[in-house]
Amino acid sequence: MTPIKKVIEYGDRSLVLETGCIARQASGAVVVRYGETVVLVTVVGMKEAAEGRDFFPLTVNYQERTYAAGKIPGGFFKREGRPTEKETLTSRLIDRPLRPLFPKNFINEVQVIATVISSDSENDPDIPSLIGASAALALSGIPFTTPIAAARVGYIDGQYVLNPTLGQMEKSALDLVVAGTEKAVLMVESEAQELPEEIMLGSVMFAHQEMQVVIQAIRELAEEAGKPAWDWKPPIEEEDLKSAVQEVGEARAQEAYQIRSKQERQASLAELRNSIVESLVPEENSRWSREQVLEAIGALEKRLVREQILSGGERIDGRDATAIRPINISTGLLPRTHGSALFTRGETQSLVATTLGTERDAQVIDAIEGERRERFMLHYNFPPYCVGETGFVGSPKRREIGHGRLAKRSLNGVVPDEESFPYVIRVVSEITESNGSSSMATVCGTSLSLMDAGVPIKAPVAGIAMGLIKEKDRFAVLSDILGDEDHLGDMDFKVAGTEKGITALQMDIKIDGITEEIMRTALSQAREGRFYILQKMNEIISTPRQEMSEYAPRMIVFKINPEKIRDVIGKGGATIRALTEETGTTIDIVDDGTVKIFSADKADGQEAKRRVEEIVSDVEVGKIYEGRVSRLMDFGAFVTILPGKDGLLHISQISAERVKNVSDKLSEGDVIRVKVLEVDKQGRVRLSVKAIGNE
């Protein structure tokens, strides 16, 4: 096959899509080049579906090869290992807009693999990877509704910037990724510096408009190089089954959805489902399978709940569309942590703890674009007990990593910089109860916990999850959605921010037809909800505590002459090692002469500072020092007056009286007061006891 290439201008750079040269045994394969970043994206679909499967097994793997940046992996094995956090997050980023575009009831296994094979450290591979996944699916013949494209938007000097480089992103007040089809936005993922709703909405619309050229290029590529479409037909809907399920279960399902408690409601629904299955799926000669009946029950439940909300009725838990669940907050509840908070909203609860550490505790990220250190870490845990289940407990799953990242992005804009608060910060959110919006409960709990720890954040941050139910021209935007509303709705829309503006926005849309007006309504309603939650939070704690926990490390920061750093460190690190051991402190020195002293006790830190200042201070002529006799000689004694600085006390200067033997007056280890008489050009110090006189 002759390679086929499409080249378009996208932003201020060329985007190249090429197929037919590499990975030709895959169902679809595209090499995407943007700048000097190159990603190979492959798609493989299985023509046959496994028997008895009732879900769509789509797997997305994004992987970065270190050779892409001309590096060899660290570690003993010198090869790539388990996925990094960036790889996990990008895999989720690709998965989220693709999944809704496969046909309903399509359950064949599909795997998308995006491999970064060249990285220029300026163009993030995530956008090319998403575009490549869309193009590979369009070429593969696998049932897939329509091509999508993706764009990143920055906001620099009041202007939207399409696909900014990593260098430009350092100056941007916005990092927003949008994926969408020709007609609709499907996904938004963003972090912002407290921007207003109109700017956020404008950036989404800007991205959607700009990405149309990419969708057109993918269509042209598929027309020229696409494989024949699979001969796949959706299973015929059983109208008789729908009628039978409705007849047996509609009234009971409506009753079950009047139960306000999540666990009681789920128990009632489980009993209902089992009852319907038993009545419609006899052991012998059954017309329908168990899976078919359960699917029909799910469709019935979805229709009932959606219709009740769209007709202006109460939601599952009795609220109206804009109401927020009851909020309970407490802070400082964990006595030994540096900061803590318990945030409860309805049946969702987050226990958050903050730990302050030294620079050595920062997380080292060995990314292909270069190594960096992260001072602010946020980890989200979702144990099985929070939803009343048993399950595996171990390393974090993709969902936990993704939710933690969203919460972190929500707080990044308000966390103080290193100059104003030199501590490393780690926050852990334990989801102890969950019924929807646990990531946004984490945002609220983290803001409270940081303030409880005395971290001077710029402003409190609250988060809220919004939902949407839409049927033709009717729609309802729901505030603070439950887990069931997320499952049965058409949109999951999470917004976090301060009173000033938005700090993070995440949106996943399952249907076409979400207009700009609907998004504007959702943002406006989210703003009202956010303000209400912030008000509740401010009633408990509205500003960071002035005093940190007594168990938090104390920090002293000061500057010394950079030329004196070697004196503080000493030969082979001996001086600084002795200093830290004797004072019980941790000392970090930066090349510019900044000294950071961390200690459990304030007095220990002050003592360490005094000793560092002694080491770097210059000997002053005429000043009296308290020194220690280090060596006795026939002609006098050497006295240490500052760490690493000795002076000669001549025998004639030991006393006003005549001294015959130095040992008659002095012994090694004696502490005596001496006055500096002179420092010669060679730095030699001459001392005297006699010159002190009556001083």
From Swiss-Prot:
PANTHER family, A to Z: POLYRIBONUCLEOTIDE NUCLEOTIDYLTRANSFERASE, POLYRIBONUCLEOTIDE NUCLEOTIDYLTRANSFERASE 1, MITOCHONDRIAL
Name assigned to this protein: Polyribonucleotide nucleotidyltransferase
Cofactor: Mg(2+)
Subcellular localization(s) per the UniProt record: Cytoplasm
Highest rank taxon of the organism: Bacteria
Upper taxonomic lineage: Bacteria, Pseudomonadati, Pseudomonadota, Gammaproteobacteria, Chromatiales
NCBIfam families: polynuc_phos (TIGR03591), PRK11824.1 (NF008805)
Pfam families the record matches: KH_1, PNPase, RNase_PH, RNase_PH_C, S1
Record key words, sorted: Cytoplasm, Magnesium, Metal-binding, Nucleotidyltransferase, RNA-binding, Transferase
Originating species: Nitrosococcus oceani (strain ATCC 19707 / BCRC 17464 / JCM 30415 / NCIMB 11848 / C-107)
